[in-house]
């Protein structure tokens, strides 16, 4: 939790060697001014990214090329990171078990994460609650994830996020895997 609660911290640390770090939990939590390029960091050995950018209100850097294939914990990773809206759709999430609250209150986040392999995830409670996830991106997510072999009885909470074209996929996840999905319901009024 190196920079936790350092609200004014915003130094250039792009050249830091973090290739042996395994736990980044809470690293930038409450570092409300931090917004530096760390997209080149080698995070391939990290297993815990829980709360890494929680309450990092200014952070909005491209970390889409991070190798997160060993990460197990992503819970509350971007919680209340109100500026973050970067493409992280190509992340390898095959080992992740906890995505609870990952984008909760991340009020700018609206990206396509439908390529994520969430077959090991057991907790998605409040994952997209009060995020800015669009119906289109939610539809893509439901359509893709319904094709995976998922864990049973996962709680998946999205607040007011609505779906339109993926009603069948959503129902399949509920019927086949007993997922408990809480969202804003069916709404196709925003389609152009």
List each language-model region with its residue ranges.
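Negatively charged
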Residues: 1-192
